[in-house]
């Protein structure tokens, strides 16, 4: 096995799938670590092409020799909930004003999608986490 490379930094970004470009926030975040920005943009866009329309979080590990690897995460629960509810944004005052309703089936479906990134042992626990996110956005779960 090759000797381990020394990690120089870890960058976390949320970028639209298939739309990474050198403009902020991507350019400055990668530039300060000396990463080839266009190389990352091409690799990210190729990896997320099938998920266009979603925001895909990415964790970029930068090594001392300026090479990098990246891991894609699942879209944020809030974005998935907004899409399921069919609204643009959550409530300004979530416990007073409710903006939409989602069913438990929709919540379970989102939990299935997010399971890899959630700190839950089973789908029921994951669904409760998603339901809590919905509640804090002013979305009612039925």
UniProtKB/Swiss-Prot annotation:
Cellular component terms per the entry's GO annotation: cytosolic large ribosomal subunit
Residue ranges that the Swiss-Prot or TrEMBL entry lists as coiled coil: none
Alphabetical GO biological process terms: translation
Molecular function terms, GO-annotated: large ribosomal subunit rRNA binding; structural constituent of ribosome
Modified how: One or more lysine residues are methylated.
SMART domains, alphabetized: RL11 (SM00649)
Protein's job: Forms part of the ribosomal stalk which helps the ribosome interact with GTP-bound translation factors.
Subunit composition and interactions: Part of the ribosomal stalk of the 50S ribosomal subunit. Interacts with L10 and the large rRNA to form the base of the stalk. L10 forms an elongated spine to which L12 dimers bind in a sequential fashion forming a multimeric L10(L12)X complex.
Family the entry assigns: Belongs to the universal ribosomal protein uL11 family.
HAMAP family tied to this protein: Ribosomal_uL11 (MF_00736)
Name this protein carries in UniProt: Large ribosomal subunit protein uL11
Origin species: Mycolicibacterium smegmatis (strain ATCC 700084 / mc(2)155) (Mycobacterium smegmatis)
């Amino acid at each position: 096995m090759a000797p381990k490379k020394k990690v120089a930094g870890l960058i976390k970004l949320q970028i639209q799938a298939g739309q990474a470009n050198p403009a902020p926030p991507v350019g400055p975040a990668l530039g300060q670590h000396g990463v080839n920005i266009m190389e990352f943009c091409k690799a990210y866009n190729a990896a997320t092409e099938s998920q266009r329309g979603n925001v895909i979080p990415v964790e970029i590990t930068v090594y001392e020799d300026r090479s990098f690897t990246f891991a894609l995460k699942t879209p944020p629960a809030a974005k998935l909930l907004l899409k399921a509810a069919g609204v643009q944004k959550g409530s300004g005052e979530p416990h007073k004003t409710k903006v939409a309703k989602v069913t438990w089936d929709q919540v379970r479906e989102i939990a299935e999608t997010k399971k890899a990134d959630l700190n839950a042992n089973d789908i029921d626990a994951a669904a409760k986490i998603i339901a809590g996110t919905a509640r804090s956005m002013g979305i009612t779960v039925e």
